[in-house]
Every structure is written in C-alpha cells, then in structure tokens.
UniProtKB/Swiss-Prot annotation:
Gene (name only): pafA
Catalytic activity: ATP + [prokaryotic ubiquitin-like protein]-L-glutamate + [protein]-L-lysine = ADP + phosphate + N(6)-([prokaryotic ubiquitin-like protein]-gamma-L-glutamyl)-[protein]-L-lysine
Signal peptide, first to last residue: none
Molecular function, one GO term: magnesium ion binding
Organism this protein belongs to: Bifidobacterium longum subsp. infantis (strain ATCC 15697 / DSM 20088 / JCM 1222 / NCTC 11817 / S12)
GO biological process, one term: modification-dependent protein catabolic process
Positions of Mg(2+) binding: E33, Y78, E86
UniProt: ATP binding residues: R76, T89, W451
Enzyme Commission designation: 6.3.1.19
Protein name from the UniProt record: Pup--protein ligase
Family: Belongs to the Pup ligase/Pup deamidase family. Pup-conjugating enzyme subfamily.
Function, as annotated: Catalyzes the covalent attachment of the prokaryotic ubiquitin-like protein modifier Pup to the proteasomal substrate proteins, thereby targeting them for proteasomal degradation. This tagging system is termed pupylation. The ligation reaction involves the side-chain carboxylate of the C-terminal glutamate of Pup and the side-chain amino group of a substrate lysine.
Taxonomic path: Bacteria, Bacillati, Actinomycetota, Actinomycetes, Bifidobacteriales
Length: 485
C-alpha cells in the first residue's frame, strides 16, 4: 500500500544531478493545487465538515491506508489541514494540459462526494446532500486556497519575482478573479481581503501572495518552484487556462532578461503597497479608473498596468516568437495574445457582459444583475446561496446550466476530462509516476511515492529518483523498479 512522504529535494541524490535539457529554453512545468470546501445540507442533525471529508476519503484510506496518495494519472490527492480535501495536478508542460488535470480533480472530488453522500443518507436522512465548493471563502469567513506552481530558472532572484511579477499577478485578477458577493458589495476576487503580505516562506502565520519556501521538486541548482498563492479557484475553464498561459509569457520575458542582462520592461511596475493595491483591484467595479501607487511614486490604474505588461510581452514575442512557440506543445502564442488583447479591450469599454462567458466574476455579476432586476427585494443571503451553487462541483446546478446553454466557454470536452482522470501527461515525469502507481495498485504492492521518489517497499526494496520533471523517458533504475513489480 502507498505511503506518502515529503521530498526534501536537496538531499535527494547521492550523485550530482544531471542538468535538465530544458534549462536554456522557455519550457515550463505547470501545476495547480486546489483546496475544496465541504458542507452538508438536508441532514436531520448536524454533520461536521471534518466527518464529511473523512467519509469522502474512506475509499482512499481503504486502498492506501492513508488520506494522502498519488493516483494513476500522476496527481496527488490528500486531505489537507482541517476539513479541506485537496488535489494537486500532475506536472504539465502546457496550460491546456494543466487545465485538463485540474478538471480531472473536480471529477475525482465529485465522485468521492457522491459516494460519501450515499453513505451519509443511510444515517442522516435520505435528503442529506454533500456540497463540495471550488471557491476560496466559506460562510464563516475562513479563506482557503488555489495555488499555482511554475518551474522557474533559479538565476531569477526572488526580489525580481516580488518587484516585476507580483504587480502582474495582482492586476491579472481583472480577468481571472472568481468574484465574491460581500455585505459591502461585489468584489471581483475572493481572497484580496485575506492576503496580508507580498512574499513569505510561511503560509500559516501569514498569508502571502507568493510563497518562497524552497521546495523545487527538481534540481535545486537549476530551478525553483514558484508557488503563487494570490489567485482564485476558477470554475471557468478559460480563466484557469488564461492565468497559466499569460503568467508563463511574463515569466519568459523575466527569465530572458536575466539570462542576457537586458531589461525586461517590468522594472518600474512594483507597487508601493501590494496588499493595498490588491484590495483596490478587487473593488474594480466600484472605480475602474482607481489609481494604484507604484514604488516610483507614479500612479496607474490596474488596467493601465496590464496594458504595460501586454505591450512589453508583445515586444518580447517579436524577437523570441519561435522559441516561445516551441515552449508550449498545445497552446499557440497568437491565441494567448489575442485573448489577452480582447479581454483588456472589453474591460476598457466596460463591456463586462462580453466577458461573462469566460470570466467567473463577470458571469456571476450578470446573474446577480438579472436576479436583482427580476426580484428587487432579493436578499444578500439569497445571492450568497446562488453564488455557492455556482461553485458547488458535487450538487450545484448553476454552472452546469450555463455550460449546457453555451453561456460559458468550455475549452475541453467531457472525453478530454475523462482521459485526464485516468492518464498522466505523457511528456513529463508524471507519466512514469502514473505508470508505477497504476502497476503497484494492480498487484497490491507495498510502495511509497512523492513528486521525486518512487519506492517499492516489499517484498524487496527498490527505488527510482525522478529529479527532472521534464523527463518522461524511463531511467534504468525505473525499469528495474517496474521489473520488480
């Protein structure tokens, strides 16, 4: 049975790691970690959220003897602190592949919830209903996260991430925010009021926008894993894909600037107060032209700063187009830039309804506005319930209704998602992890796994180390591990 262990990358290997062949290019590894909220309605007596989560994970515990496991598609499934089930996608080379893996996580969580619901109904009422929320704030005001992971070349200093990337991450929420109804009005993000630091290595005693804890899950001399905490959980497929795609292009420009010792174009974008800027961006609809103060003393609107990033990336593409194109197997640079340009133009015009088929906050705003027109006496509590239904991946109806009526863009089909549930990406080390986990489960072997280690613990101990996340070809030690199965 599998056991989970944490991987401390710097002590992984007895010999010096072989530098990745991708170190000199623009290829990247993408990943998304999503914490889900759980609740039960319709029960005859209260059901603790922690009990619900444990009931959901009972099949996992029965199979793996743990609430932490890796799946045959290369992903990690585990029960996080408290009652939040979490799914971390397998390593992907393309935002589209990462999107498919993220949607596979929704599928897995939904199935776990519906199985647990049948069990709960035996004890708590035939009407007991489990809700699994892909959002970031619960009704008690507790925040939980959606974290993006990007493999970044280590020669880029953390100070540069804070000063050149963070302003982009804050203002990209104009089109990636999930939106939230609050007693004080509608915000375009979910977590702005909960993030209090720009960068930090802690995530418990503080709530940073970017986590700097050094766990690259790769050669630590070549790469760091950028752990982005600012960002909402998205139902919109377009938003999940878009936030990964545009962030990749900005990171490419930053990396190339440090590689060559040239300006990136983002040197003067740092905010004087990132947390204050984040809160202002979240209230974009209150004042779309609100000015944000930069460290230089200059003031600029969120949209104005996004246009600066867009212009700098466009100029970068003109001289690096071929190299950038080869960095993404399934997404074209033309598509990313076209979508970016169109969304900025729509925001400039105030044409928020034009974004309602792809941007979560715009979709929710359209729904709330229509509801208030039909029912002027609608209460905040009723709108809050509608919002929760939008985020409920287990028993919610609203988002599914939007997609079935083509009011929300879908980039992947149901077959694409079903494939991602059972299969890892074929061009990263996730392919090897998935192959090992699938084989070990099929024969009932005792094994352990993490992002960089695969270990057979009985009847004989064998181990394979997968330090290069880009490498999908079996190593001799991996082949020996598989033969031992």
């Amino acid at each position: 049975m599998p056991q989970l262990r944490d991987s401390g990358t710097r002590s992984l290997h007895a010999t010096e790691p072989v530098p990745s062949a991708e170190m000199d290019g623009f290829c990247r590894i993408f990943g998304v970690e999503t914490e889900y909220g759980v609740a039960v309605t319709g029960a005859e007596r209260p059901v603790d959220a922690g009990q619900v989560a444990m009931t959901m994970f009972q099949p996992i515990v029965s199979r793996s003897r743990s609430t932490n496991t890796y799946l045959a598609n290369g992903s990690r499934l585990y029960l996080d602190v408290g009652s939040h089930p979490e799914y971390a996608t397998a390593e992907a080379r393309d935002p589209r592949e990462a999107l498919g893996q993220d949607l596979a996580g929704e599928h897995v969580m939904r199935n776990l919830a519906l199985k647990a619901q049948r069990k709960l109904r035996e004890s708590y009422s035939e009407h007991a209903t489990i809700h699994v929320f892909k959002n970031n704030v619960d009704s008690a005001g507790h925040a939980f996260g959606c974290h993006e992971n990007y493999l970044v070349r280590r020669f880029v200093p953390l100070e540069t991430i804070e000063h050149q990337l963070l302003p982009f991450l804050i203002t990209r929420q104009l089109y990636t925010g999930a939106g939230r109804m609050t007693p004080d009005g509608f915000q375009i993000t979910q977590r702005a009021d909960f993030l209090d630091e720009a960068v930090s290595s802690a995530t418990t005693r503080s709530r940073p926008m970017v986590n700097t804890r050094d766990e690259p899950h790769a050669d630590p001399d070549s790469f760091r894993r950028l752990h982005v905490i600012i960002g909402d959980s998205n139902r919109s497929q377009w938003s999940t894909w878009m936030k990964l795609a545009v962030t990749h292009l900005v990171l490419c420009a930053i990396e190339d600037a440090f590689r060559l010792g040239t300006p990136s174009g983002f040197e003067h974008c740092a905010f004087a107060d990132p947390a204050a800027a984040n809160r202002t961006v979240s209230r974009f609809l209150d004042d779309p032209h609100a000015e944000l103060t930069l460290e230089s003393g200059e003031s600029v609107s969120a949209l104005g700063l996004q246009r600066r990033y867009y212009a700098a990336v466009k100029a970068f593409i003109e001289t690096h187009g071929d190299a950038l194109a080869s960095s993404l197997p399934a997404t074209t640079i033309v598509t990313i830039m076209g979508e970016w340009s169109r969304v900025l133009d729509a925001l400039e015009r105030g044409a928020y309804d034009a974004l309602a088929d792809r941007v979560d906050w715009a979709a929710k705003k359209r729904l709330f506005d229509a509801l208030k027109r039909r029912r002027p006496d609608v209460t905040f509590a009723q709108m809050e319930q509608l919002e929760l239904d939008y985020h409920d991946i287990a028993n919610g109806r609203l988002y599914g209704s939007l997609t079935s009526r083509n009011q929300m863009r879908e980039l992947l089909t149901g077959d694409d998602v079903e494939y991602a549930v059972h299969n890892p990406p074929t061009d990263t080390r996730a392919a090897l992890r998935g192959r090992f986990v699938d084989a070990a489960l099929n024969v009932g072997a005792q094994f352990s796994a993490d992002w960089t280690h695969l270990t057979l613990t009985a009847p004989e101990r064998r181990e394979a180390i997968l330090l290069d996340p880009f490498e999908a070809e079996p190593t001799p030690e991996f082949e020996q591990l598989m033969e031992a199965l």
